[in-house]
Amino acid sequence: MTSALTHLGAQGEANMVDVGDKEETTRTAIAEGFVSMQPETLKTILAGNAKKGDVLGTARIAGIMAAKKTHELIPLCHPLLLTKISVDIEPDHALPGLKVTALARVTGKTGVEMEALTAASVACLTIYDMAKAVDRAMLISGIRLVEKTGGKSGDYKVGA
């Protein structure tokens, strides 16, 4: 683990990291999040019967769009030419609820962790928004980086 925060200057001021001299490499990040809900809410979403429409399809697109706008949402994030973004949403009947997995990929000079995390977060928020009329007690949890590959800092995988 790195001991220094890369976005802070000598006086503690926030700065955008200069990545100009870094090598371009293929970088991938996978993030996940969960939306817990009542079993009946999950059943309604999976059946495609939510009043607002296709919850899963809309959340998937929202996550993809959010990843592309990460640099506009998070200060000091570099704009990236993303080569792939995918958002997968699967039922988890044990929660009960939905598991969101977002993958972001780029060939560039900086990582895509924030893009994957933003995609997962916004997909979860969209699920909540589209189903809140029937279940305001839904819980968004477990947003985290699961895996990253590429770049100077090396690879990372949860539990490894």
UniProtKB/Swiss-Prot annotation:
GO biological process entries: Mo-molybdopterin cofactor biosynthetic process
The organism of origin for this protein: Mesorhizobium japonicum (strain LMG 29417 / CECT 9101 / MAFF 303099) (Mesorhizobium loti (strain MAFF 303099))
Family: Belongs to the MoaC family.
Function statement: Catalyzes the conversion of (8S)-3',8-cyclo-7,8-dihydroguanosine 5'-triphosphate to cyclic pyranopterin monophosphate (cPMP).
Name assigned to this protein: Cyclic pyranopterin monophosphate synthase
Catalytic activity annotation: (8S)-3',8-cyclo-7,8-dihydroguanosine 5'-triphosphate = cyclic pyranopterin phosphate + diphosphate
Active site per the UniProt annotation: 129
SUPFAM superfamilies (UniProt xref): Molybdenum cofactor biosynthesis protein C, MoaC
Keywords: Lyase, Molybdenum cofactor biosynthesis
Residues reported in the UniProt entry to bind substrate: 76-78, 114-115
Superkingdom: Bacteria
HAMAP family from the UniProt entry: MoaC_B
Assigned EC number: 4.6.1.17
Pathway membership, UniProt: Cofactor biosynthesis; molybdopterin biosynthesis
Complexes and interactors: Homohexamer; trimer of dimers.
Gene Ontology MF terms in the entry: cyclic pyranopterin monophosphate synthase activity
Pfam family for this entry, one: MoaC
Top-level enzyme category: lyase
